[in-house]
Amino acid sequence: MKAGAVRIGWFLGVFFGALAAQAQENGGWECSQAKIRSAQNARLAARAAYPGDTLIDMKYLKLDLTIRPENKYIQGAARHIFTAKSGISEVSLDLTGQLKVSSVTSKGRKLTYSQASNKLKVSLPAKLNTGDSETIDVMYEGTPPTTAFGSFSFGTHGTAKAPVIWSLSEPYGAPDWWPCKDDPADKLDSTQVSITMDKSYVSVSNGTLMSVEINLAANTKTYVWKNRYPISHYLVSVACSNYASYDLTWEYGGKTMPVSNFVYPEVLTQSVKTQIDRTVDMLTFFSDTFGEYPFITEKYGHAMCGFGGGMEHQTVTSLGGFSESLIAHELAHQWFGDKITCKTWADIFMNEAFASYSEALWAEKRTGKSAYMSNINGHITRAKTVTEPVYISNPKDENLVFDYNLTYGKGAVVLHMLRGVLGDAAFFDVLKGFMASEYAYKSATINDFREFAEKRSGKELKYFFDQWVYGTGFPVYKINWLSAGANQLKIEAGQTGTKLFRMPMEVKITFKDGKEELRTITIDKATNVFEINDLTGGEVSEVTFDPNGWIMKTMTVGKLELLGNEPAADEKWAYPNPVNDILTIKVPENGLYELEIRDIRGGKVDLREVTKGKVDVSRLPAGKYFLRVLTAEKAVNGVFVKE
């Protein structure tokens, strides 16, 4: 193109900003670290049994464990009651090959079985038809596999090196210590776990403590715990050490529930007690927000274990410390993860996104909106770095399932944005309603939640989940606005990228007298033009887009100015205005400039190439036009009127 020429371009450009942020250690971060270790991930994924035997429906587990920490050995007796989902003569349970089965019986009758490739296959005493039930007892023993993931671990704590034993089965670790059906969707109706150890130990599991049996001859104690609520296999847990007890009581809706905390003696200081005390207020807040605590007839509590972070075992969280955000995160899991569990590990959003978002809700409750936004903005910064969808493409990759930036961070941001789309009243009604829905004490997929949210709120949300949960990326907005006279505002909002996003965006309009008005526009195309002619505050002085930060995005905003009706050639850079035929563009020196012109509806105006800053606009229809001239240093915006 010739020197001094003016070329026609697009009105909208894309400007990307780079943001750097440090990952903050919060409850979600601690939770993710507890659930993922890189050293053994490939090995664990290779032997993952998921989704277990699809032809049976598990009903009941009675698990009797004897644990010998001195040689890291366990002996187990697992009674399973299950029903057949079709005609079967054989059942398959998932159990590591490092634990050897010594017998399998049914009502005292020995059954034929084989153990290979981390599977226990049992021939049933008779063929089962659909709906028939059966009971089998599996006797096994051995040393659980030692993995960095820590499905069943032996450790010590304190200067005295007191032993501590704990389980952490999520996602694929339960077969490392008991024979099970390795599928989070198939919940047991109830469980009983008995733990026998040296009498110096306190042993903790799910539900209510039924008895403590002392065997003086063997110098042992047996703790018997009964859980009467549906429970996913990976939430069955044990934790054993020389715990000191710190017991609280929570009252809600006329009901009383124990909050039982099992803490290392050397850790149980007044400061730690103060941290734990927050649990009671959190129980009330989350019950008000999501519905009554799901296991109120049993308990809630914590058991300290030898890992950093936490694990939301049903009714008793296992954790390594008592930070406020970790307590909030794991408690929220009792609703999102335990009461309603992800149906597949690809749907881990149903667990971790909600628990991470609940941290922000608790921060908002405790400290205010600024604390909430600080939490969310941290997640937004990290979420912008991810390239995978929130719906997990490879659920056998624990690095991906428990990726903090993705599953926890972006997951929380998705819920924040959904709150913005629905509004507070509808959003929290959806959450509380979902907890009381057909999925209560069962499992659900992300799509189940979407369909429920649509039905409950009356809003179509497929577009939202498609782009934010099943898709990747985020919108990049370039927005310009013009105060077009009293009570009039014109906005041109564009987005670029490999895909376009559809999102409602709040617009805060500030008038010269200081009054404000809030409107909402929906940006869903590459170029969007909005003319607002029914304002009530007079002349607009400022416009703020997405003032409450509901959208994960990058955005640049510019203000257009009217060029004036009586321009002087030495004062104005584009004149005359209004113009009939030739518009003069005043530039500081010869060179290459980009001239961008669009009509007020956002359509690109096609002009011939011109020189010497003269633009022939005689063929343009009468009306207002956006004008922009770009130099190497800056861009100058304006509006001219064609008569």
Regions found by a protein language model. Give the residues of each.
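Glycine/proline-rich low-complexity spacer/linker segments in large multi-domain proteins
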Residues: 53, 130, 139-191, 249, ...
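Amphipathic alpha-helical substructures
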Residues: 404-491
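C-terminal outer-membrane/trafficking sorting elements
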Residues: 19, 568-575, 579-643
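Hydrophobic helix-coil surface modules that form long, contiguous segments used
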Residues: 76, 167-171, 181-328, 357
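N-terminal, polar/Ser/Thr-rich
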Residues: 23-75, 159-163, 462-463, 467
